[in-house]
Amino acid sequence: MELKTKSGDPARQRTACVVVGVYERRRMSEAARAVDAASDGYLSHLLRRGDLEGEAGQTLLLPDCPGVRTDRVLLVGCGRERDFNERTYRKAVTAAARALEQAGTGEAILFLPELPVRGRDVAWRVAATAEILETTLYRFDTYKSDPRPPRRPLRQATLAVPRRADLRRAQPALTLGQAAGRGANFSRDLGNTPANICTPGYLGEQAEALAQRFDGVRAEILGPAELEEQGLAALLAVARGAEAPPRLVVLHYRGADDDQAPVALVGKGITFDSGGISIKPSASMDEMKYDMSGAAAVFGAVHAAAEAQLPLNLVAVIPATENMPDGRATRPGDIIDSLDGQRIEVLNTDAEGRLVLADGLAYARRLEPSEVVDVATLTGAAIIGLGHHRHAVMGNAPGLVRDLLQAGERAADRGWELPLDEEYDEQLRSPFADVANIGGQPAGTITAGCFLQRFARGLRWAHLDIAGTAWKSGEHKGATGRPVPLLTHFLAGRAGWTL
């Protein structure tokens, strides 16, 4: 989708559709009042008649609004004016995007970014609108024999800002928001691709394609022989039962001087998780193709950083394998080595994500990053604790954790911090090895974080457990693209971009 910004009078726009907001109790936004004045009170008449109540997310398409130059006017409900906030704003933009696509307008000028949102400026509104337009209209029909795309999809949208002086701040915000949305959609494509296609080798191919697409991106792929030579024993231990060979995918993005230390992202890339010998129940096992959502999020963040041309250096490390049962597979009770040098007692082969991340973190340390953030669908306990709304966030650097949480607030992609106290770490003691890979049922998300912390020695490190947020089940089944928006805003902050 092509996105632009402008400033102007909604009644004077020559376009297929102008989008304006209407609150409850027949209260109109400034743009709606301008259209109402030009149409000799036409909107007021419709609102008095009850054609639109103004509830958040309601829409009403007017094909022949008198007195204006646009072909159509789309009214979007914004709820009660005094309660209008970030959540209501995003709901209104989402409803507008869907209504425009359904109407087949092809293009539109949205005056929603002119709406005042408590605590947020015009740059935030433009970035949020751009991201929502990209993600709301996402479709994944690659493997349907008759996909039937929209007859006239929304191909161009212009975001109107209140004053011409706002355009200077609106353009970089538009760039960042659209990059976050496109990065999230790229992540969703990877997550939704079935595991018979999205193998570790496929992720390597996607990395090479990303390097071909964007200047400043370079891909490095390590296969089984290189992994053995480099000593990534924990990753190889998880891969023993799989037919598909493992990979370590490394993406380098250079947007700053070479002497600037990179930010490192490490993404769990389990392209299918059967549980291994500790096999999972069959119900919903198809959703275990999403166990590479951490890797997909890291891919999406690199995509967003490269598209926005963020002025920072970034490295992404993705340990990728399947976790399958086989006569060669790692067994419960086995003791395995790791790149870090610590030996791990594997008490449960379905706690494999932390094993590949252990090697991923150790490999990232070799690249001398300024800080490391790992992303993983790591524990079902995260769903018990936080449901499907917030990511679990942990780390050994309070400032880094704070910045991630604040980025999540800006992006409406929120996290919640959990502790990593020593008492939790004690649950990982093993009588036979340096550490056990599970700490029992209590506080499973925290003990998983404690395990990773042992392999993040010497690093400023944070961990995002996205087990509850990476995909949806049921009627709207599919990858969400989270936490790409959070990561994009975090990286933008590290690059000196602020909204």
UniProtKB/Swiss-Prot annotation:
<feature type="active site">
    <location>
        <position position="354"/>
    </location>
</feature>
<dbReference type="GO" id="GO:0005737">
    <property type="term" value="C:cytoplasm"/>
</dbReference>
<dbReference type="Pfam" id="PF00883">
    <property type="entry name" value="Peptidase_M17"/>
</dbReference>
<dbReference type="Pfam" id="PF02789">
    <property type="entry name" value="Peptidase_M17_N"/>
</dbReference>
<dbReference type="InterPro" id="IPR011356">
    <property type="entry name" value="Leucine_aapep/pepB"/>
</dbReference>
<dbReference type="GO" id="GO:0030145">
    <property type="term" value="F:manganese ion binding"/>
</dbReference>
<keyword id="KW-0479">Metal-binding</keyword>
<keyword id="KW-0963">Cytoplasm</keyword>
<feature type="binding site">
    <location>
        <position position="350"/>
    </location>
    <ligand>
        <name>Mn(2+) 1</name>
    </ligand>
</feature>
<feature type="binding site">
    <location>
        <position position="273"/>
    </location>
    <ligand>
        <name>Mn(2+) 2</name>
    </ligand>
</feature>
<feature type="binding site">
    <location>
        <position position="352"/>
    </location>
    <ligand>
        <name>Mn(2+) 1</name>
    </ligand>
</feature>
<keyword id="KW-0378">Hydrolase</keyword>
<feature type="binding site">
    <location>
        <position position="291"/>
    </location>
    <ligand>
        <name>Mn(2+) 2</name>
    </ligand>
</feature>
<dbReference type="InterPro" id="IPR043472">
    <property type="entry name" value="Macro_dom-like"/>
</dbReference>
<dbReference type="InterPro" id="IPR023042">
    <property type="entry name" value="Peptidase_M17_leu_NH2_pept"/>
</dbReference>
<comment type="similarity">
    <text>Belongs to the peptidase M17 family.</text>
</comment>
<dbReference type="InterPro" id="IPR008283">
    <property type="entry name" value="Peptidase_M17_N"/>
</dbReference>
<feature type="binding site">
    <location>
        <position position="268"/>
    </location>
    <ligand>
        <name>Mn(2+) 2</name>
    </ligand>
</feature>
<keyword id="KW-0031">Aminopeptidase</keyword>
<comment type="function">
    <text>Presumably involved in the processing and regular turnover of intracellular proteins. Catalyzes the removal of unsubstituted N-terminal amino acids from various peptides.</text>
</comment>
<feature type="binding site">
    <location>
        <position position="352"/>
    </location>
    <ligand>
        <name>Mn(2+) 2</name>
    </ligand>
</feature>
<feature type="binding site">
    <location>
        <position position="273"/>
    </location>
    <ligand>
        <name>Mn(2+) 1</name>
    </ligand>
</feature>
<dbReference type="GO" id="GO:0006508">
    <property type="term" value="P:proteolysis"/>
</dbReference>
<keyword id="KW-0464">Manganese</keyword>
<keyword id="KW-0645">Protease</keyword>
<protein>
    <recommendedName>
        <fullName>Probable cytosol aminopeptidase</fullName>
        <ecNumber>3.4.11.1</ecNumber>
        <ecNumber>3.4.11.10</ecNumber>
    </recommendedName>
</protein>
<dbReference type="GO" id="GO:0070006">
    <property type="term" value="F:metalloaminopeptidase activity"/>
</dbReference>
<dbReference type="InterPro" id="IPR000819">
    <property type="entry name" value="Peptidase_M17_C"/>
</dbReference>
<feature type="active site">
    <location>
        <position position="280"/>
    </location>
</feature>
